[in-house]
């Protein structure tokens, strides 16, 4: 890759719902095309949260550099604007060294904001707004707060789980601070052209049952790998690990630690929450322009992805 010209940097993205094999495909592409992986996962940035976030292991990296993993302690916050700025630096550095940036992950807002060049305003929320909304949430509960978001920004609400209090609060905070819905912000903040030349490969299974079986199996393997201890670590620090405490994979076990639910019930709740999350991920990526979808269960999925990537790079 020639970094000396003024052409847009080339970026290949591997996206899709959880448990579709994105990590393995990203590594395979990196091995073939001298690539480096940039994580597009909103939870894998946190140190010490390995099992519940399905963080890539040293063995799984196969020596391929992975950026955007293990960079913050769990009490820190990390916004989509932070991600686009950091990932942009990674892309510039990787491209300058003659390597291919590979964006791999399932956080659709991260992928779309980076590749489509969404600009984020520097407007700061009025002092006390977050505290006011938080107090309101505690007073009326998450369901009523989610209903408020549905009333002012149904499009944003559709992409957020009703129990994800952090994202519900952020969306409401944005609306009250700017007078605009997040969907309007997206439209207003799109620049005339995209900052990168990109190929977006989406992984999914033709049969939804196949994906759900993989999700259930992944949860079982996570428990064997120490998920419960990690979830207890988050539970004990839930007042400071606010983002992690809302994450799928941890919060489902809080009733078990509080001795109000059995472990089996919490495990089933996690499996259901993971399946629901996968559906929301698919909804997001299906609405994204320019995604080339691949059958994650096909025997030749890697070969197909390699061929498409080769064709994409040859056009540069």
Language-model region placement:
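Phosphate/pyrophosphate-binding catalytic cores of soluble transferases and nucleic-acid-acting enzymes
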Residues: 1-316
């Amino acid at each position: 890759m020639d970094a000396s010209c003024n052409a847009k940097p080339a970026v290949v993205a591997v996206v899709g719902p959880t448990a579709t094999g994105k990590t393995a495909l990203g590594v395979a592409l990196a091995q073939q095309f001298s690539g480096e992986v940039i994580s597009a996962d909103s939870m894998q940035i946190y140190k010490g949260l390995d099992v519940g976030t399905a963080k890539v292991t040293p063995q799984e990296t196969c020596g391929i550099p992975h950026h955007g993993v293990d960079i913050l302690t769990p009490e820190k916050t990390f916004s989509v604007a932070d991600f686009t700025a950091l990932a942009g630096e990674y892309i510039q550095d990787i491209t300058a060294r003659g390597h291919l940036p590979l964006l791999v992950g399932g956080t659709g807002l991260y992928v779309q904001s980076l590749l489509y060049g969404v600009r984020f305003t520097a407007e700061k929320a009025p002092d006390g707004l977050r505290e006011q909304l938080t107090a309101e949430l505690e007073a009326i509960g998450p369901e009523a707060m989610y209903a408020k978001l549905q009333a002012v920004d149904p499009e944003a609400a559709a992409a957020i789980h009703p129990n994800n209090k952090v994202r519900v609060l952020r969306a409401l905070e944005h609306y009250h601070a700017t007078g605009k819905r997040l969907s309007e912000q997206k439209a207003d903040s799109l620049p005339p052209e995209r900052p990168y030349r990109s190929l977006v490969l989406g992984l999914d299974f033709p049969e939804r049952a196949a994906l759900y079986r993989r999700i259930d199996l992944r949860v079982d393997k996570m428990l064997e790998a120490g998920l419960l201890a990690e979830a207890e670590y988050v539970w004990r620090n839930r007042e400071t690990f606010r983002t992690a405490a809302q994450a799928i994979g941890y919060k489902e076990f809080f009733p078990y630690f509080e001795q109000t639910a059995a472990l089996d019930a919490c495990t089933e709740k996690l499996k259901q929450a993971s399946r629901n999350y996968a559906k929301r991920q698919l909804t997001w990526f299906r609405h994204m322009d320019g995604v080339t979808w691949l059958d994650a269960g096909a025997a030749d999925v890697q070969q197909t992805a390699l061929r498409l990537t080769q064709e994409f790079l040859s056009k540069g």
